[in-house]
Amino acid sequence: MSTYFVGDLHGCFDELQKLLERVRFDPVKDKLYFTGDLIARGEKSLECLRFVKNLGTSAQTVLGNHDLHLLACAYGIKKVKTRDNLTALFAAPDFDELMDWLRQQPLLVHNDHFNFSLVHAGISPDWDMATAQACAREVEAVLRQGDYRALLRQMYDSRPERWSSDLQGIERLRYSINVFTRMRFCYADHRLDFDCKLPLEQAPSELMPWFACDNPLFKTENIIFGHWASLVDCPTPGNIYALDTGCAWGNRMTLLRWDDKRIFSQSAVKKTGVF
């Protein structure tokens, strides 16, 4: 049995299949995890969603910002962007079934046995693991059983910028969504910044990557995430695994075999997105 993690798919189905062939992935005995953003930009979002869904318990994804935006589009809250290449997905006969399945996916997977935490973008510098898990469960409960349409409608805001245990209602849910699916840079006081999308070496000096903030969790927890394609080839601490390497932008897709921490890469078949 092997455990694998794959960075953001963004509809790049062919590259995923090539990677899985290389490592001889066996859904009968292996487990495959995804960092979210299964869809958008690449040409085979429908195939990616169907594949992950049909793997059943052999696969697990977390929700990314593009996945949540897809849900907002599916329920008529937002309009689909042409550049996201989602025409085939929206026309699929199993579209509603796929959206129901996607809405059930978590924001955080924490595994004590294999000693890892999986998220799309990151974990708040103000959270310990118990708080991170609690905040993830709060959002997931609304998406799965609550007034998810209202949540999807109100999630498009970068406020609040800073965590407080006193946060309630939509502000608390929105902060959690932004941390788990959108965060990249933070200030020294742990305020979130959503304006800067530059590579680390070009970012303003007052900003730091979320995992460089002062939080004991970031020194002890193995955290696996995607989302940040411009981190490609940038060094991170040994327990921090950034797996989005920009396949949809013409770079490559990355797979991590957890058993021996070996990295496998597959070059993009073609560039389909705009970075």
Swiss-Prot record:
GO terms for molecular function: bis(5'-nucleosyl)-tetraphosphatase (symmetrical) activity. Its EC number is 3.6.1.41. Keywords: Hydrolase. It catalyses: P(1),P(4)-bis(5'-adenosyl) tetraphosphate + H2O = 2 ADP + 2 H(+). Disulfide bonds: none annotated. It is an enzyme of class 3 (hydrolase). It comes from the Bacteria. Belongs to the Ap4A hydrolase family. PANTHER family: CYTOCHROME C5, PTHR40942. HAMAP family: ApaH. Hydrolyzes diadenosine 5',5'''-P1,P4-tetraphosphate to yield ADP. This is Bis(5'-nucleosyl)-tetraphosphatase, symmetrical.
